[in-house]
Curated annotation (Swiss-Prot):
The lineage of its organism: Eukaryota, Metazoa, Chordata, Craniata, Vertebrata. Residues 513-711 form the B30.2/SPRY domain. Transmembrane segments: none annotated. Residues 342-437, 438-531 form the Fibronectin type-III domain. It is found in: Nucleus; Sarcoplasmic reticulum; Cytoplasm, Perinuclear region. One of its GO terms (cellular component) is sarcoplasmic reticulum. Interacts with CMYA5. In cardiac muscles, identified in a complex composed of FSD2, CMYA5 and RYR2. Keywords: Coiled coil, Cytoplasm, Nucleus, Repeat, Sarcoplasmic reticulum. Expressed predominantly in heart and skeletal muscle (at protein level). PANTHER family: E3 UBIQUITIN-PROTEIN LIGASE TRIM36-RELATED (PTHR24099), FIBRONECTIN TYPE III AND SPRY DOMAIN-CONTAINING PROTEIN 2 (PTHR24099:SF6). The keyword Aminoacyl-tRNA synthetase does not apply. It comes from the Eukaryota. This is Fibronectin type III and SPRY domain-containing protein 2.
Length: 716
């Protein structure tokens, strides 16, 4: 009955091995377990636990060779997918498909595996049966703050305890970001150090190569010098030996000659001795006969002086060896050779001022130089025929700023390198040029309108310059203060520049050449309010006088010239008039003329090539308003090509406004005081025109320009 009950209670796990036991659920909190796992959950949990244990054992004993050495039968096993692991010990067929082989059932296999596990781990069967797989505990809450004092991550709930209560903490994300920044900084430093070390290693390699090159060069230098010294010594040895041999030959020849002479004398003495001995054996009579002759012969022989002194001494004079040239060669042997010729660089842009230039040169890297000798002289035309003075200066660097020069002048430079071995060859000559002198703006020639300005200047340099630059500074608005606009590449001494209307500008001019830029010229101020112009004194009739400010024309009461003035293309000779210089800009130009009520005058415009021998308005190149006062009556004429309309003006104007409108091809006159329109010419202006003024009688008129256009004029 008990076995049947066990079979009924163990439904679903009847195939489990008999020696495999589980602890009863009574070991745990049964009430809690019942609440968490209602129903048959305890049975299911035991099955899952047993299946996991089987999988663990199967993984551990997958090595067939190891199992064989232990004396246990090997099992061909493979890792099984946990999702496909059998849930019931009774599913034997499914277990066979999952990898159990050898003809054994799952119960026998599991039992053998457990026996092997107990054997290899040194456990008894009872000890194995006490093994319990604990339940997985819930994961702890991750740390979300970082204790800066302890330098460890903690949870928020722990920072209120005694351990971290007084410590400084920060959010874990912020600490992580800070740590990443520190790591990044250290990595950057490390990368920089790596780069520096790589550069240093490259530099060391270059130094190694340089050492080898210098060694080879010095070795070649020593070999060359010492070979020269040996050749010199060998030559001197040959010369001395040859001279000594000559002296030896001379001595031997002298001694040999003396030896021959001595032998001859000795033979003569012996002959005389033999002759005397023979005479002594002769008879007395014969002896006396021969004795007289022999006596004379002996007397003559004895009178002959025999030189017994040596003609040549065997000793040789001590020879003084002159090694001065060898010493010079020895002194010339240095560790460094004489430098090569320097290479003088071309002039760099903007490297000069009006009185100085910066000269640069380079030298071969393997040359050692102690100083440089820089020489220069001005470049002049060959036609001048004057000797050019040369100047020399010693410098230590490979550059030099030469001062006290003439502006906008070319100079020829060359350089020599020197060290203790000697000077180098001279470099090639290079031409440098000083910057120009600052130009001078002709303030009296400035012409402007609301849209542009025409400025002229004098170069201030004897030699031509490459170009000019005009600098403009707008001086009215605070936000534009100090902002400089430049117009560059101006080839001539004048420029027409577009500007903004109703502003004030400060203008400077600079001159440029290959050497650099000159200093700024003196400033000139320009206002783009109305049209501003000056009177052209070259066109002024001799009877007229222009005031110092250039805006008042005066005709004094003087007698006329008896002789007529010769014709001129620029100066008025018949009409007592003068022209103004209006800026050549097609637009609207306005100016005013103040006149006396009874003054005879003519105002208007005319082309530049208007005939100077004709009255204004008497040709097709001039448009004028003429006023004459006759018999207490005012007469006004608007003349063009000697024609005038019939117009009567009741109010004599004291200030006449003139509006020149190129766009609409009109020339209008106004009475400024009463804002009255007087007359308008409709004229086709194919060329630029200029204001013109004439006085028929003595008096003066004043020109007002550079003023804003009145409102009543803007409607025309």
């Amino acid at each position: 009955m008990e076995e049947e009950a066990e079979e009924e209670s163990g439904l679903g796990r009847s195939a489990a091995p008999k020696d495999f036991h589980f602890y009863h659920m009574d070991l745990y909190d049964s009430e809690d377990r019942l609440q968490l796992f209602p129903g048959d959950s305890s049975r299911i949990r035991r099955e899952v636990t047993q299946a996991e244990d089987d999988r663990e054992l199967g993984d551990e004993f997958v090595d067939e060779h190891r199992l064989g050495t232990l004396g246990y039968p090997s099992y061909g096993m493979r890792r099984r997918d946990p999702g496909r692991e059998p849930r019931d010990w009774g599913e034997a067929a499914e277990a066979e498909d999952l990898g159990y082989g050898g003809g054994q059932g799952p119960l026998d296999q599991c039992q053998d595996l457990r026996e092997a596990y107990r054997y290899t781990h040194g456990r008894a069967s009872e000890e194995y049966e006490c093994y319990v797989i604990p339940e997985e505990e819930d994961e702890e809450e991750p740390a979300d703050v970082f204790c800066i004092t302890c330098k460890t991550p903690v949870r928020t709930v722990e920072k209120d305890f005694d351990t971290h209560k007084e410590h400084e903490v920060t959010p874990i994300s912020k600490a992580l970001e800070h740590a990443k920044d520190e790591v990044h900084k250290n990595m950057c430093k490390l990368e920089q150090q790596i780069i520096e070390m790589e550069n240093f290693a490259s530099h060391l390699e270059e130094v190694f190569i340089t050492v080898e090159e210098n060694f080879g060069r010095q070795e070649q230098n020593f070999e060359c010098h010492y070979n020269g010294i040996l050749e010199t010594l060998a030559q001197k040895y040959e010369e001395k030996i040859q001279a000594l041999g000559e002296k030896k030959r001379e001595k031997l020849e002298a001694l040999y000659g003396q030896l021959v002479s001595c032998g001859e004398n000795l033979d003569a003495c012996r002959e005389l001795m033999e002759t005397v001995e023979e005479m002594c054996h002769e008879e007395k009579v014969e002896f006396l006969k021969d004795a007289v002759a022999m006596t004379d012969r002996l007397g003559k022989f004895l009178k002959t002086k025999t030189d017994v002194e040596l003609s040549a001494q065997p000793e040789f004079e001590d020879q003084t060896l002159d090694f001065s040239d060898v010493e010079q060669l020895m002194d010339a042997i240095n560790t460094i050779p004489a430098p090569s010729a320097p290479v003088i660089n071309p002039q760099a842009p903007n490297s000069a001022t009006g009185s100085s230039v910066r000269v640069c040169w380079s030298l071969y890297s393997d040359d050692t130089v102690e100083s440089y000798q820089l020489s220069y002289r001005p470049v002049q035309d060959s036609s001048s025929g004057k000797d050019r003075a040369e100047f020399t200066m010693m410098v230590k660097e490979t550059y030099c700023s030469v001062t006290n020069l003439e502006p906008n002048t070319q100079y020829e430079f060359w350089v020599i390198a020197q060290n203790r071995t000697g000077p180098s060859p001279c470099s090639e000559h290079a031409v440098y040029m000083t910057a120009p002198s600052p130009p001078s703006i002709k303030t009296e020639a400035i012409r402007s309108c609301e849209e542009a300005v025409l400025i002229c200047w004098e170069s201030g340099n004897l030699n031509p310059v490459d170009s000019y630059t005009v600098e403009l500074i707008q001086a009215e608005t605070p936000e534009a203060s100090g902002v400089t606009e430049s117009v560059v590449g101006i080839p001539t001494c004048e420029s027409l520049i577009q500007l903004q209307p109703r502003h004030s500008y400060t203008i400077y001019v600079r001159a440029l050449n290959v050497g650099g830029t000159s200093a700024r010229s003196e400033p000139a101020t320009v206002h783009t309010t109305g049209s501003y112009f000056q009177l052209n004194k070259d066109t002024c009739h001799p009877w007229l006088t222009i005031s110092e400010d250039g805006f008042t024309v005066v005709r004094s009461e003087k007698k006329s010239f008896r002789k007529e003035l010769p014709p001129s293309k620029t100066q008025f000779t018949r009409c007592v008039a003068v022209m103004g210089n209006l800026i050549p800009v097609r637009g609207r130009h306005y100016w005013e003329v103040e006149v006396a009520e009874h003054l005879d005058y003519t105002v208007g415009v005319a082309c530049e090539d208007v005939p100077k021998q004709e009255d204004l308005g008497a040709n097709s190149l001039s448009w004028c308003m003429r006023h004459t006062f006759v018999s207490k009556r005012h007469r006004y004429e608007f003349l063009h090509n000697k024609m005038t309309p019939d117009i009567r003006i009741t109010v004599a104007p004291r200030k006449i406004g003139v509006l020149l409108d190129y766009e609409n091809a009109k020339l209008s006159f106004f009475n400024v005081d009463i804002a009255q329109h007087l007359y308008t010419f409709s004229c086709q202006l194919h060329q630029f025109v200029h204001p013109c003024f004439s006085l028929e009688k003595s008096g003066c008129l004043k020109i007002c320009n550079g003023i804003s256009m009145p409102k009543h004029v803007t409607f025309f």
